[in-house]
Structure formats: C-alpha cells, structure tokens
Amino acid sequence: MLFERPQDGSSTAIIVHSNYSLFSQDQSEFKELVSSAGFFPVLELRNNRKYPEPKFFLGKGKVDEIKACLKQTKADLVVLEDSLSPSQERNLEQFLKRKIIDRKGLILDIFAKRARTHEGKLQVE
C-alpha cells in the first residue's frame, strides 16, 4: 500500500524517538524538523529497544502501541527519528495503514517543498 505525500500543514503526525539513534540527543530539534516539513506533531513516543527489529524496525509491542495511538489521535502519519529500510517502511505502512516517514524521507520532503529551480527539483527526485 503506497500513500501520497502529505500536503503542507494539513497532516498530523506521531513522532517516534529512539534511544539508539545517532540523532536522539536533541528531540526538540527533530520535532522542529517535523514542523518545518509542514506536519503538526500530536504525540511523541520513545522506542527503548537496544537493537532494531528486522521486520518493523520497532518491536511488536511498540508497533501495537503506535496503532492504538493512531486510532486515538487520528494522526495522519508516523515520523521515525531513524532511517528505515524500504521493506521496514512497507511493513509498517501495511500494518498501521498510515504513511511512514523516516528521518531521510523527512529531510527530502523539506528539500522538495523548498526547491525553487528546475535543477533543484530534479536533484531532490
């Protein structure tokens, strides 16, 4: 299941921080990055696993918790602080029925939205 790229300011997001991320030191910076992409954070969760799981990157319990939070908050997407493999992203999207964006995808979305020249837009593609 593939989802369209969300529009500016119209999407609410659940942010998942991670203890083993290279970037986990500054959660507020990542939250600002999410806001810069035009998403409104409605909830922040922390993943405390020491190692990523091959299927979902997150543990099954955390994925179930996110699913319950999505139902409760009606958030449009989930943003993970870490980088996912394509199969992990696909597995999460299929299980959660929501768009999943990792750190790399978030940064590319920001660049894509702010690219002004034709060359800049091509580089983001």
Regions found by a protein language model. Give the residues of each.
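Extended, highly charged alpha-helical segments
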Residues: 106-125
